[in-house]
Amino acid sequence: MCLCRVQLRLLGKVLSRDYGYVAADVRAVVEAAHGRGALVKVIFENCFLQDEHKEELCRVCGEVGADFVKTSTGYGDGGATDHDLALMRRCSPPYVQVKAAGGVRTFDRLLAVRALGVSRVGATASKAILDECRARLKG
């Protein structure tokens, strides 16, 4: 199955609370992608948003059928915070997965975000995380 990434480039519409516009735009992508067997991941760029925006975006993404919500591209300030990850999990329907990007560089951090309900992680330190996991398994 293919994955269609929708990077939220509708920042002005979100900040002005024009969620009808945002929903229509994301819905169009979801319908086109799902019609071709692809999944849809909506990237928020949380460092630019207030909690109320993140909450509403999670609701909208669930309503229009997005498969994932993602904290950021990983290039913005701050990375995936516990606060944002818990908020996104709490505000998204159970069928919408949460992906953390930025700030997951150790096996312990991976376990911590997993405990918050994250099902996917974007990490540049994947090799180091896996090496740490293997070392622990060897005991």
Predicted regions, residues:
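Alpha/beta enzyme core
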Residues: 1-98, 106-128, 136-139
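Short hydrophobic "strand-cap" motifs at the C-terminus of beta-strands
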Residues: 101
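C-terminal active-site subregion of NodB/CE4 polysaccharide deacetylases
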Residues: 132
